[in-house]
Structure formats: C-alpha cells, structure tokens
Amino acid sequence: MPVWVLAIVVLGLALIAVLIAAVLRRRKQTGIEEALTEISLDSIRDVVIADGMDGEIHLEVLVLTAQGLLVLDIKDVRGSVFVGERLNDWKVIDGIQRYSFPNPLNTLAERVAAVRHNAVDMPCEGIVLFGPNAAVSGTPPPGVCLPDDLVERFPKPGERERRQLSEAYAPHWSRLRSLCRRP
C-alpha cells in the first residue's frame, strides 16, 4: 500500500475521532433549557412580585420542582468563573477577555425572601445557575451550580408522583402565579 494512502487513512481516522469527541462532549453537558425542562413541574419567567417591604422585585425564573420552589439567577457565561460567597465581584476569564459582575448571591437571597413572603406554605430556595460553557473554579459556594448539578440535585419524579405533587402544590402555585406580573 502506498504511503500517501496510509497517510490519508490515518488523517481521516484522526478527524473522525476528533468529531466523535466533540459530539460526546456536547451531549454530556446539559444546557440551561434542558436542565429547566428536566427539573420543572412548571415555571414562570421574567416577572415581578411584591417583596414584602412595600416594593417589588424582579424574578428571572421561578421554577416549581418536586422539592418546592426554586428561584434562579441565570448566568450564561463562557470561560473560567471565579466565585466566592464573600467576594463582592465575581470574575470571568475567557481567553483574553476578562470581566466581572457583582456577586449575585445577595440579590438572590432578597428574591428568595420575596417568594417566601408570598408563598409561606411552600419550601423555597435560590440558585445562581451558570451555563454549560462556564467552568466554576474551586468548590462553588452553596447556591451556585451548573446545569448537570441542577438536574442531579432536583430530580424529576415519576409520572404518578408528579401528578400527586402537582395536585398538592396547585393551589399554592396558582396563588403565587396570580401575584406575579410582567415588568
């Protein structure tokens, strides 16, 4: 067999291996929308709700899960993310691009408090959700996760349990939805 044929075969196999690795890497990472679909019994987006202190607060995403209510602050960034519970600013580094944004945990706590004020009979927590293209450095503080972690933490129940939960949560969820309005 001529050497040039062997070289073409080797290059072709290498290209196929690279493509397969890229596809598997993409499949492995759950996207934000996929994660929300996976965990939610229902959800509402981009609403304001009374904060319990004569004001209103914006909710990006409010999800009804099998465990109760989940307030999400979504950060769909690309690159390495340096976060810390006590840091004032969080940093994102993606190649030569670098930027920072205010630590969202404090405002997330305010959003969770507002939801708890309006839905006292339901458990509620908040999470800062980074997209699959983010790599959170070190151990993320409580309340920070990636889509795969979210799906693992809030597993969707089976159909029977889902119906029971939906019925149990229905009056509370309906009331909460009625208290929300579009900004």
Which stretches of residues belong to each language-model region?
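A broadly used, surface-exposed interaction patch
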Residues: 84-92
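Polar interaction faces of repeat-based domains
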Residues: 81
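Surface-exposed interaction regions that form or flank ligand-binding interfaces
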Residues: 1-57, 63-69, 76-78, 92-183
